[in-house]
């Protein structure tokens, strides 16, 4: 399912939230409707942690994570770290990273199996990403942009990349990630798809400005109509039911 939301007049949902298959981290703020969207879809399924990171609300840009782990910058306070540890499932590893490129959400794009990272991240950071998130790590650019986390949104089902990504690059990335990719936009033409939305295997949340066409592309490439949270990892439904859902 794909839904639209706004965080205090901002459509950049991926700036203020981080969504995975085992938890969600959402910024603390005055946006009740923003929380209610997440709570309506996730409440009984995965924990939603209301948090700040390094005293700021841009939790989606400062963190990177998947079902197995969460990476936070070294500027994260001890209290914030403890709050995350108390709220997130015990199976999720939480690790502070000392890294010059500290907006981890901008420089790391990952699902539960693979991470695409900024070419200039330190070697030690690359090892921590592989260890904590349990993924294969590749240094990559998206349409010649080094900010992989900003210009790509990825789940275990599919991904959306910067609208100017060439067909050749899309094919290359798709075979690397082993998921279908599409070049697209969110929030009425924004190329910053990673910061404009959050997605896991059964839910996408995008900005209120996202058009119906953009939303249908998102639902299609991430295969969001196919299974609810209970069905994650159980394989997808057969093709007939997908075809029927278009009528």
Swiss-Prot record:
Subunit structure, as described in the record: Monomer. Associates with the 60S ribosomal subunit.
Modification Phosphoserine, positions: 174-175
UniProt main location, coarse: cytoplasm
Protein name (Swiss-Prot/TrEMBL): Eukaryotic translation initiation factor 6
Keywords of the record: Cytoplasm, Initiation factor, Nucleus, Phosphoprotein, Protein biosynthesis, Ribosome biogenesis
Annotated signal peptide: none
Job description of the protein: Binds to the 60S ribosomal subunit and prevents its association with the 40S ribosomal subunit to form the 80S initiation complex in the cytoplasm. Is also involved in ribosome biogenesis. Associates with pre-60S subunits in the nucleus and is involved in its nuclear export.
NCBIfam families for the chain: eIF-6
Record organism: Aspergillus oryzae (strain ATCC 42149 / RIB 40)
Family statement drawn from the similarity comment of this UniProt entry: Belongs to the eIF-6 family.
GO function term, MF aspect, one: ribosomal large subunit binding
Gene3D superfamilies: L-arginine/glycine Amidinotransferase, Chain A (3.75.10.10)
Localization in the cell: Cytoplasm; Nucleus, Nucleolus
Biological processes, Gene Ontology terms: assembly of large subunit precursor of preribosome; cytosolic ribosome assembly; maturation of 5.8S rRNA from tricistronic rRNA transcript (SSU-rRNA, 5.8S rRNA, LSU-rRNA); maturation of LSU-rRNA from tricistronic rRNA transcript (SSU-rRNA, 5.8S rRNA, LSU-rRNA); ribosomal subunit export from nucleus
Cellular component terms per the entry's GO annotation: cytoplasm; nucleolus; preribosome, large subunit precursor
Post-translational modification as stated in the protein's UniProt record: Phosphorylation at Ser-174 and Ser-175 promotes nuclear export.
């Amino acid at each position: 399912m794909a839904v639209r939301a706004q965080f205090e007049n901002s459509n950049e949902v991926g700036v203020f939230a981080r969504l995975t298959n085992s938890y969600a981290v959402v910024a603390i703020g005055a946006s009740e409707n923003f929380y209610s969207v997440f709570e309506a879809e996730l409440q009984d399924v995965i924990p939603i942690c209301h948090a700040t990171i390094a005293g700021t609300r841009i939790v989606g840009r400062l963190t990177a994570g998947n079902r197995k782990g969460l990476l936070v910058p070294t500027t994260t306070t001890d209290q914030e770290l403890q709050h995350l540890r108390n709220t997130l499932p015990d199976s999720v590893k939480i690790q502070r990273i000392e890294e010059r490129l500290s907006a981890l959400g901008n420089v790391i794009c990952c699902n539960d199996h693979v991470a695409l990272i900024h070419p200039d991240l330190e070697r030690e950071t690359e090892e921590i990403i592989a260890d904590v998130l349990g993924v294969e790590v590749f240094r990559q650019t998206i349409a010649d942009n080094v900010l992989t986390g900003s210009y790509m949104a990825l789940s275990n089902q599919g991904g959306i990349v910067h609208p100017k990504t060439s067909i050749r690059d899309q094919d290359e990335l798709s075979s690397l990630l082993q998921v279908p990719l599409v070049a697209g936009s969110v929030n009425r033409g924004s190329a910053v798809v990673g910061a404009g939305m959050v997605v896991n295997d059964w839910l996408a949340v995008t900005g209120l400005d996202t058009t119906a066409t953009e939303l249908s592309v998102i639902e299609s490439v991430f295969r969001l109509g196919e299974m609810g949270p209970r069905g994650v990892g159980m394989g997808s439904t057969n093709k007939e039911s997908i075809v029927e859902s278009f009528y």
